[in-house]
């Protein structure tokens, strides 16, 4: 670390170069300090030594500034990549500038950053009067009992702020100003599949090709999307939907123009073309999504509050004396008991139990969800009426026990209104009930008016591990039609018409058996007015595992109202891992028996291969007792950085088929065009300029292209996403200061994760000046050829050694060890043509 001519510290980015040599320097200094303390006549209470001892022992120039190394915990000021903790909870990771204040490193944090952390700035006039960009190095000067501390070895910055001056924010809360709208871009997600089919006894073959395209464009907060398909069977392109969308942060909502679907919690959903404003729960922290009760209590002192469910701690916090409210519990099960433990400062504990239960429609206390839709109904059959309409819905959590909801649909020949409530019965579970009234003009002078009733019940039996849900959904009177049924109503030539639903019953039970596995039962039945019979589906199953072998037994029953026949299938599946003999593979056996007494047997071998397991394969052979037919299948899929390729071959007694496919994405962005795997909704552009073939951790097959770019095809919107590069996959000529970036994309965004790379060589220089070694503590800086080049500096260690990475084949290095003109020099270097096996060049360099 050096000083300029004015006596100020020169700051620079601290990188791996410093880490490589700082430890030997500190060991050397500590050794000298120990010797000095042993021979000194005075004893000090802290680790301190006279820096002049270094001059006498090592011949250092008297003007070199090494005062920052005097104390054991002292490090040079500069910019460090640190984990940031607020009151012992990690809130961020990033670059922070540090300066020397009172002989220790102190962070420079802007006032607006404290506000973003949740500090109530308005409580402190001296703070609120400052501009938002004001850099604060000692927050304790403004807020009593506030402080910061930096653990250099752990690269951890701890900020302590009294809880009383923090605004109440939910856990995992991400401020909206951190949400990133992303880059302007164009994108295409494609999925191509084709097949060649041969039938025995018929000449030639038939070919089928299908292309699925999901294309779009991003500009600021706006997202334009289109979904189109092409089929060779009818040789026709079809545009299925097009819409323009953006988020409205202040309303926690999405605004959509074009083709979309109405939300379905209250009314059955249907497709429309128009405009919609709808709540988006993704904008809420995980701790505020779904349903969880609000906990209220009173603390007599500074107390610890612990909340347990089923004996496990699910929440813990500290509160000040007086009433407290906890409203950011994560949703767990649909019902149960919460044990609340308040531990006072003197060790006394107060315990209480709060039961809760929730059906899917229920919201947290004071939570609001809404939707507003204007548009034109889109008939899926293209034979129904397509009127203009308006639909509005609202749901509100009144308390822990009550949620109310309602909505309306208005059209020229149809209107309906729905009102309902969800109610918690505590230990008895929870239920919801609503009524919908509708009046419709089905055809000219044909009017219909009726009601529909919906009931839903949910209960978790914690003691037995049973989850039980029953929904009497819905019972409708003869003249009730929902909006879709009314528009699809059609009188045929024989005076019959499309029947409307009469009732629908659903049942779902899931039972855990502990180590013995689990069972489930799912049942569904629906019938219609003016139509005999009913539609019924039943499925049940049991699953368990023993010695890593998985067993599954399933039964299904299905019946349509238009027929008296039903289908029943019983199946047994056994999956055996083959890791001992073949890595990442397993064998399966399946036995299936149908009501028609057709029995089939299937054995298969499945697995993954290659270094990153991005090649999957499957081999199957089956036998059916019906006509003694046999068949088989072999298929494989490769998942690469630029897309996914699959192929397969099927055969049976009468036919053969060869199928193939290609899936992937193409993204055009401000830095060029990048090919990728199949695209999701929210994307990340990895930019490691010039670093080819660098893998992205936790994403199979994804690596940077020849320019250093890659697309991460899916990310969580409005959440912190950590994008990390695999440093072991970097070339010898690639160096990077920070291998992890944190981004917070909005829905549909292409967000940039920009990694600062240095492309060049690694060099260890043995520096000398006028026949003497360059003193340790000096700085060696690569002279920039362009203003856009990143700074590249290091500290000279003992023996005059300087390590630099990411430097070009030839160049100039500026060395400085004091604030006098005579205490600097420059060295021109040229690396040999032959690259050493270690990848590290070692050169002797005379500095002039």
Range-by-range predicted roles:
Residues 190, 213-217, 241-246, 392-396, ...:
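Residues on the lipid-exposed face of transmembrane beta-strands in outer-membrane beta-barrel proteins
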Residues 84, 297, 684-688, 761-770:
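A short, amphipathic beta-strand motif
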Residues 184, 205-211, 236-240, 291, ...:
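Residues that define the transmembrane beta-barrel architecture of outer-membrane proteins
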Residues 259-271, 432-503, 553-573, 591-600, ...:
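Outer-membrane beta-barrel translocator/channel fold
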Residues 4, 44-289, 595-667:
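Post-signal-peptide, soluble extracytosolic/periplasmic N-terminal scaffold domains
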């Amino acid at each position: 670390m050096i000083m300029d001519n004015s006596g100020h510290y020169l700051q620079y980015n601290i990188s791996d170069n410093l880490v490589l040599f700082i430890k030997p320097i500190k060991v050397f200094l500590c050794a000298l300090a120990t010797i000095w303390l042993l021979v000194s006549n005075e004893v000090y209470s802290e680790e301190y030594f006279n820096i002049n001892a270094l001059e006498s022992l090592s011949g250092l120039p008297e003007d070199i500034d090494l005062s920052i190394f005097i104390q054991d915990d002292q490090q040079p000021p500069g910019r460090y990549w640190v984990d940031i903790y607020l009151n012992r909870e990690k809130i961020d990771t990033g670059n922070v500038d540090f300066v020397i204040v009172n002989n220790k490193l102190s962070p420079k944090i802007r006032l607006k950053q404290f506000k973003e952390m949740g500090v109530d700035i308005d409580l402190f006039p001296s703070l609120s009067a400052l501009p938002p960009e004001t850099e604060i190095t000692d927050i304790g000067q403004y807020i009593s009992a506030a402080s910061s501390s930096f653990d250099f070895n752990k690269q951890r910055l701890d900020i302590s702020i009294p809880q009383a001056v923090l605004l109440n924010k939910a856990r995992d809360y991400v401020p909206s100003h951190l949400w990133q709208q992303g880059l302007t871009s164009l994108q295409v997600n494609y999925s191509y599949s084709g097949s060649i089919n041969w039938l025995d006894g018929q000449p030639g073959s038939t070919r089928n090709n299908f292309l699925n395209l999901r294309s779009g464009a991003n500009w600021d907060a706006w997202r334009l999307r289109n979904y189109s398909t092409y089929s060779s069977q009818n040789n026709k392109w079809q545009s299925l939907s097009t819409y323009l969308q953006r988020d409205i942060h202040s309303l926690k909502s999405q605004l959509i123009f074009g083709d979309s679907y109405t939300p379905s919690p209250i009314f059955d959903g249907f497709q429309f073309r128009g405009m919609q404003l709808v709540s988006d729960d993704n904008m809420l922290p995980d701790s505020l999504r779904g349903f969880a009760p609000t906990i209220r209590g009173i603390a007599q002192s500074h107390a610890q509050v612990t909340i347990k469910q089923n004996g496990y701690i699910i929440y813990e916090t500290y509160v000040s004396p007086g009433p407290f409210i906890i409203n950011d519990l994560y949703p767990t099960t649909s019902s149960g008991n919460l044990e609340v433990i308040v531990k006072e400062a003197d060790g006394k504990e107060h315990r209480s139990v709060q039961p809760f239960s929730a059906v899917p429609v229920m919201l947290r206390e004071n939570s609001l969800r809404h939707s507003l839709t204007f548009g034109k109904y889109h008939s899926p059959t293209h034979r129904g009426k397509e009127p203009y309409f308006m639909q509005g819905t609202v749901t509100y959590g009144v308390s822990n026990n009550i949620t109310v909801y309602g909505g309306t649909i208005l059209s020229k020949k149809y209107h309906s209104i729905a009102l309902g409530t969800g109610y918690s019965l505590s230990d008895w579970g929870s239920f919801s009930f609503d009524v919908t009234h509708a009046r419709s003009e089905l055809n000219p002078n044909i009017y219909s008016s009726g009601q529909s009733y919906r009931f839903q019940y949910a209960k978790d039996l914690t003691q037995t591990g049973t989850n039980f849900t029953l929904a009497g959904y819905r019972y409708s009177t003869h003249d009730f039609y929902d909006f879709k049924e009314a528009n699809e109503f059609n009188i045929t030539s024989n005076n019959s018409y499309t029947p409307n639903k009469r009732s629908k019953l659903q049942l779902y039970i899931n039972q855990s058996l502990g180590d013995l596995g689990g069972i489930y039962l799912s049942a569904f039945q629906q019938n219609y007015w003016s139509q005999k019979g009913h539609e019924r589906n039943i499925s049940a199953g049991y699953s368990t595992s023993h010695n890593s072998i998985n067993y599954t037994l399933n039964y299904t029953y299905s019946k349509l109202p238009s027929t008296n026949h039903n289908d029943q299938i019983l199946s047994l599946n056994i999956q055996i891992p083959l890791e001992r003999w073949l890595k990442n593979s397993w064998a399966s056996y399946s036995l299936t028996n149908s009501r028609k007494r057709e029995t089939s047997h299937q054995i298969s071998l499945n697995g993954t291969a290659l270094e990153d397991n991005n090649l999957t394969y499957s081999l199957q052979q089956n036998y059916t007792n019906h006509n003694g037919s046999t068949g088989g299948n072999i298929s494989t899929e490769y998942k690469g950085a630029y897309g996914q390729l699959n192929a397969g071959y099927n055969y049976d007694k009468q036919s053969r088929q060869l199928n193939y496919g290609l899936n992937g994405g193409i993204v055009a962005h401000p830095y060029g065009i990048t090919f990728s795997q199949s695209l999701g909704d929210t994307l990340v552009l990895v930019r490691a300029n010039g670093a080819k073939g660098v893998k992205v951790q936790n994403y199979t097959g994804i690596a940077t292209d020849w320019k250093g770019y890659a697309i991460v095809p899916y990310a969580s919107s409005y959440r912190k996403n950590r994008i990390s590069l695999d440093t072991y996959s970097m070339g010898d000529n690639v160096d990077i200061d920070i291998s992890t970036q944190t981004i917070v994309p909005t829905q549909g965004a292409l967000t940039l994760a920009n990694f600062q790379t240095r492309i060049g060589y690694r060099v260890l220089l043995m520096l000398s000046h006028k026949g003497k070694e360059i003193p340790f503590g000096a700085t060696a800086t690569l002279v920039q050829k362009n203003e856009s080049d990143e700074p590249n500096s290091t500290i000279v260690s003992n023996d005059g050694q300087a390590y630099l990475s990411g430097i070009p084949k030839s160049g100039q290095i500026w060395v400085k060890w004091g604030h006098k003109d005579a205490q600097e020099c420059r060295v021109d270097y040229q690396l040999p043509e032959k690259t050493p096996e270690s990848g590290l060049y070692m050169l002797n360099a005379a500095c002039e």
